[in-house]
């Protein structure tokens, strides 16, 4: 038995991923819970049930009750969730006036929040505002926080002045804490529902940041491919690179940067190819089976 076990939860656009990871980084168990809701606006209502389902399945797969010492929460960003659960996914398109865009630049979040607020004004009146992982952390701990990957990211988030410029109040936003910090302790009632002790809940943050940390792309010259519904080829560098087609963001390591080439639809295209193959063979395929098929057939659409 390992000394410490960590439940790592990541919220995607279509599923919740859960992994039990040891203190040495060994993945002891992994599973994916797909969301059922066809209404993307209420998708956040499924997240807690997905956590319960994941824990139940992890325990069923184990010969003994799973021991969990802490929980880490990450998720896609910038998905926005209001206190009443209205959800605006990170891949949804927005359209706002250039004058507004200029006023709140370079924030990656405020343009989406402004657009969402105008669509659902009642959900924003004196109510808390979260990203996806922060909303689940709030549900688990009752703590309202904002996860900041590194101090240089503040401009990409918000300031009090910019929040007020779109007629919202700074009090609606959680206080900044850094990735890896303890966001709180599992609420007593929630702990009982999940059949867990009141363990620490750790701020994982945006899935992009967690993927960079998890693959140890934290030294100059290291590279990783982060793929989901979209994809990014990421390079760690000590020099920021600004060029069309590349996105440069601070690394979680002070003084370093992450340069990415983004492929916005590669994951969706892969799924479309998989579906076509399933129709052809008349049965559902796991991703492992489809990848094996592609690797054996250079002429296949998914090669």
Roles of regions detected by a PLM:
Residues 1-87, 123-126, 192-203:
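N-terminal glycine/serine-rich phosphate-binding loop of ATP-dependent small-molecule kinases
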Residues 11-13, 103-206:
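Gly/Ser/Thr-rich active-site cleft segment
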Residues 17, 141-144, 283-303:
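Conserved ATP-utilizing enzyme core subdomain
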Residues 18, 38-39, 43, 51-52, ...:
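Structured N-terminal alpha/beta-domain signature
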Residues 24, 77, 134-135, 182, ...:
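Short glycine-enriched loops at secondary-structure junctions
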Residues 56, 114-118, 271-278:
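Short glycine/serine- and small hydrophobic-enriched flexible loop segments
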Residues 74-77, 179-180, 227-229:
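Glycine-rich beta-strand-to-loop/alpha-helix junction loops that act as flexible
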Residues 80-102, 126, 130-131, 141-160, ...:
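Glycine-rich phosphate-binding loop of actin/hexokinase-like ATP-binding domains
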């Amino acid at each position: 038995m390992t000394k410490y076990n960590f439940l790592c939860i990541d919220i995607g656009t279509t599923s919740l991923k859960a992994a039990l990871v040891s203190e040495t980084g060994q993945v002891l168990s992994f599973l994916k819970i797909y969301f059922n809701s066809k209404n993307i606006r209420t998708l956040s209502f499924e997240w807690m049930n997905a956590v319960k389902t994941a824990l139940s399945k992890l325990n069923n797969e184990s010969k003994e009750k799973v021991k969990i010492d802490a929980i880490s929460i990450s998720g896609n960003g910038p998905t926005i969730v209001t206190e009443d659960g209205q959800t605006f996914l990170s891949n949804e398109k927005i359209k706002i006036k250039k004058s507004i865009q200029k006023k709140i630049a370079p924030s990656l979040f405020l343009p989406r929040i402004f657009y969402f607020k105008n669509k659902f004004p009642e959900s924003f009146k004196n109510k808390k505002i979260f990203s996806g992982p922060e909303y689940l952390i709030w549900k688990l701990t009752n703590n309202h926080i904002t996860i900041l990957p590194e101090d240089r990211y503040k401009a990409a988030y918000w300031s009090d002045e910019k929040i007020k410029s779109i007629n919202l109040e700074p009090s609606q936003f959680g206080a900044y804490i850094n990735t890896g910090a303890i966001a709180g302790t599992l609420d007593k009632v929630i702990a009982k529902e999940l059949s867990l002790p009141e363990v620490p809940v750790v701020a994982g943050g945006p899935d992009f940041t967690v993927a960079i940390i998890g693959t140890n792309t934290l030294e100059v010259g290291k590279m990783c491919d982060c793929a989901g519904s979209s994809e990014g080829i990421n390079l760690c560098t000590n020099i920021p690179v600004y060029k069309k087609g590349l996105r440069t963001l601070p690394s979680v390591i002070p003084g370093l940067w992450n340069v990415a080439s983004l492929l916005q639809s590669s994951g969706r295209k892969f799924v479309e190819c998989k579906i076509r193959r399933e129709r052809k063979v008349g049965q559902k395929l796991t991703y492992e089976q489809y990848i094996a098929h592609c690797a054996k057939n250079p002429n296949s659409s998914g090669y």
